[in-house]
Swiss-Prot record:
InterPro entries: GCS_T, GCS_T_bac, GCST_C, GCV_T_N, GcvT/YgfZ/DmdA, GcvT/YgfZ_C, TrmE/GcvT_dom1. The glycine cleavage system is composed of four proteins: P, T, L and H. Belongs to the GcvT family. The gene is gcvT. It catalyses: N(6)-[(R)-S(8)-aminomethyldihydrolipoyl]-L-lysyl-[protein] + (6S)-5,6,7,8-tetrahydrofolate = N(6)-[(R)-dihydrolipoyl]-L-lysyl-[protein] + (6R)-5,10-methylene-5,6,7,8-tetrahydrofolate + NH4(+). This is Aminomethyltransferase. One of its GO terms (biological process) is glycine decarboxylation via glycine cleavage system. NCBIfam families: gcvT (TIGR00528), PRK00389.1 (NF001567). It holds the Pfam family GCV_T_C. It comes from Salmonella enteritidis PT4 (strain P125109). SUPFAM superfamilies: Aminomethyltransferase beta-barrel domain, Folate-binding domain. The glycine cleavage system catalyzes the degradation of glycine. It comes from the Bacteria.
Amino acid sequence: MAQQTPLYEQHTLCGARMVDFHGWMMPLHYGSQLDEHHAVRTDAGMFDVSHMTIVDLHGSRTREFLRYLLANDVAKLTKTGKALYSGMLNASGGVIDDLIIYYFTEDFFRLVVNSATREKDLSWITQHAEPYAIDITVRDDLSLIAVQGPNAQEKAATLFTDEQRHAVEGMKPFFGVQVGDLFIATTGYTGEAGYEIAMPNEKAADFWRALVEAGVKPCGLGARDTLRLEAGMNLYGQEMDEGISPLAANMGWTIAWEPADRDFIGREALEMQREKGHEQLVGLVMTEKGVLRNELPVRFTDAQGNQQEGIITSGTFSPTLGYSIALARVPAGIGETAIVQIRNREMPVKVTKPVFVRNGKAVA
């Protein structure tokens, strides 16, 4: 039987259509996925992301452990509350998960990992933490609400205490702070400003209702997917998985190659891939009628005249742009155009960087 978050009842009261998402009953939409998408791009929307897993790590060697566990380097984290995005890789350089790490003190770091990968993540972390004597606490006592959009921070702040408002005032992106009952982070999955707010489970329903009263629109998984795709953000299981390198998933920027003597899981495999060459993740835009969908083939002719083929990893109609967009994993050497086979039609597409919308504006 699928699990329910502490906000399940609130979703049904808001008229949600509930679906099973990796073993969790989650809202797909509350009537109109399109309206929810536009609310986040133009005003403020909120998502229940309590199905994600918060993991607290304590111990004097926590930083040392994370420098080995992750491809990005937590040595970069020197300011309290600063966050870092990283892949957690296997020995062959495949992505076990992508996650966010927060630094609080030398013996306290926090991870936020995906729901679909929860069990294997916890198993992997526990297995590798043992030699470092790390105390691992899974925070199932916390709910997580993402409030996103150009007016999201202002509307969310109406629920904060004076102390909380003061703590987040002017806080830069990718920081988090614990004030009272709330852990407030300037992170998100939409390409808009906003907060991801963790709170005790018993406080979540009241907080959700207060956000509704403050004019924040409840949004479901459907809008979350179109928003993240417009923003060029990866979805685990589509853009990357245990058989796909971060180098082939537009995550090269998350690999800290320096210092050269830092050993991290997957480093040797990545160095070989970097030397040999690898696939790349690109954006595709199709302004003609039709929708680019996952797993459609992408064909092009390289500079040497060879026929090459890749695959769409995520595709949709973009509500913000009014045409179809996609992320595709393709062999290196793709030019500015390609062909996508949609049923029995060969459709021309423009090849772009893998990002389409930032802060409500087109960038593709």
